[in-house]
From Swiss-Prot:
Gene3D superfamilies: GTP1/OBG domain (2.70.210.12), P-loop containing nucleotide triphosphate hydrolases (3.40.50.300). The keyword Transmembrane does not apply. This is GTPase Obg. Its cofactor is Mg(2+). Its main location: cytoplasm. The gene is obg. One of its GO terms (molecular function) is magnesium ion binding. It comes from the Bacteria. Residues 2-160 form the Obg domain.
Amino acid sequence: MYNFKDSVNITVVSGNGGSGCVSFLREKFNAKGGPDGGNGGSGGSVIFKVRENLSTLSFYKNGHVLCAENGKPGMGFKRSGANGKDLTLFVPPNTEVYNENDGTLLYRLKNLNDEFVVLKGGRGGLGNWNFKTSVRRVPRFAQPGESGNSLSVRLELFLVADIGLVGLPNAGKSSLLNRITSAKSRVANYPFTTKIPHLGMLRRSYDDLIIADIPGIIKGASFGVGLGTKFLKHIAKTKILALVIDISEANFLESYNILLNELKSYSHKLFNKKKIIIANKLDLDGSEKNFDCLIKALGKEKVVGISIYENRGIDELIKEFFILAKTF
């Protein structure tokens, strides 16, 4: 699993145009031939393009300067210089390109093969043969190539998932993601094992669901405590919230209320999303009793009890995920 980056700042530079050539035709039987300097090639452009198999911006590093190729100068015999190669920068779907200087949204790259030319390369200069006239038969000058441009941009990737697994640290979100998808999210028995969102694909027949394991939320996250609001904005992009509760803990109801309060504090729109509550760790002592209490306390809320260790309730949960997804 690559490191997840939700935003990165880079500078892109388009290529300079090649200079026009000053040249005169010199042949065995034509010692004083006319001007024949060719045009310079165009500089390469900078293009952002969506690639299907990318899911993060981790390929790019903050502060990187990425340059397209310069055009080549013109040559004699009216030969044009080669154009500089375009610089194509591949990004995942749902990447937004901003002007870093003023924050303007330049383009939103959503779908496979979407592309955006952020900077065009400089034009090549004209060779001296272009400047020959009836009164100026021997032009001893040519145009320089047009300079390329540079731009500092911010790339932002919005994590888009059908279902977001939301819970306090160590609630079992990563283990659940690993169980129901082919993801390999890190699992350990200490808080904040998941420090970046992980995505997994849940497949069933002809249906696919993208499941996101969001880093653990703690009290005050909506105000920047813990991993803060950095990933709450990604939760806002998911269609359905799956609140994962460690049902073996004595304070399971408090955990549930903390999650709701943080979602509500961040935005009412987020709080009002469709939800399913997952009571995890039913295999541990006292969990069954707590599970019954949770169902009574939540009333009409949809609650599914599971044990990842015993593979219990997993099929029912997957079924509920697909049922909820079809309501959109």
